[in-house]
Amino acid sequence: MKKFIFFFKNYCYISGSMLLFSLIDLLLWIISLYCVGLVFWILFVLQCIYFVWWLWKNIFYQLNSFGLVNFVWDNPLSVIIGKLGTGKTLLLTYLSQTMKLLTDEIYSNYPLEDDKVKVLTFKNLDFTDRTKPVPPDDSVILFDESYLYIDGTSPHDEKKVHSGKIPWIVLARHFGNRALFTAQREGMIWNNIRQLASGIIIPISLKKPVIKKGFNFFNRFFIMQIGIFQDITDYEIWKTKSVERTAEGKRVKHKSDVGLGIRFFKIIIPLEFANKYDSQWLKFVRDLKNDEIVNKKEYYWSEITKLSVKERLELFDIDILKKNLKPKKEKGNGKDD
């Protein structure tokens, strides 16, 4: 039943993304009712071409959605790597909805407007912690901004602090957990996770809905192209070759290779999924700092000339200048004049 509901919803999303073309096809059909001869057959052929295109696209996107769900389910550890704005959190949120096809145990470390998604922190995965439990069998764990929790650029230092997470990382598949971690660079992900990850997901491009007055009904979908790799080494090789082709002025190839476990495909993400999370939910951290500041006076640059040199130096807070321009203590004379 879940698969049928998922298929039907996906069908509606995909059909909705092509609604404008469907209206054009309907218009052609209405016109053809009043035409005869060559014009009728031309319109008939155009309708047939549209129908074949619509059917192929619908099947194409349906298979891609099912393929992504199965890929995540088959890999206990996956990482999503992409620069700022490529849609990493959007993809996690999309999976928070589509993975319900296989399980009801969904956890995330960032807020989602979904009553079925549970809160998770890094302590849930720490075996030295005795306050929060490890998620049960068949759980999907969505972990955004992993760099905020573990500094992947300092693996040796982090290993001392986060050694309690290693048992979970190694035994995730035995626990029936499926986890996804995001980062802007592969080097930002902790080495213990990166090397054991059997799923590498790369958001390559993201076509956002264009918000225009009167056309919002036709622009309620994101189209994301992603690449999936089964090993970090395969991804690094592909990335190196892509950089070389770009440097030579050539187009980067997004060609799937089933033998190497490399696939590229597109998925449609409804705008309603994107509205389930706040991309700036961590802005409360700013308030933690600002609430402790007593003097919150701000200056305009036009007011700087009214300050003394010493006040300017204190205001700009340039440590090197403050250190070197600090008045030296005068040495006292050894004997009276």
Swiss-Prot record:
It comes from the Viruses. Keywords: Host membrane, Membrane, Transmembrane, Transmembrane helix. It is found in: Host membrane. One of its GO terms (cellular component) is membrane. The chain crosses the membrane at residues 4-24, 26-46. InterPro entries: P-loop_NTPase. Its main location: host cell. It is a multi-pass membrane protein. Disulfide bonds: none annotated. Belongs to the plectrovirus ORF2 family. This is Uncharacterized protein ORF2. It comes from Spiroplasma virus SpV1-R8A2 B (SpV1).
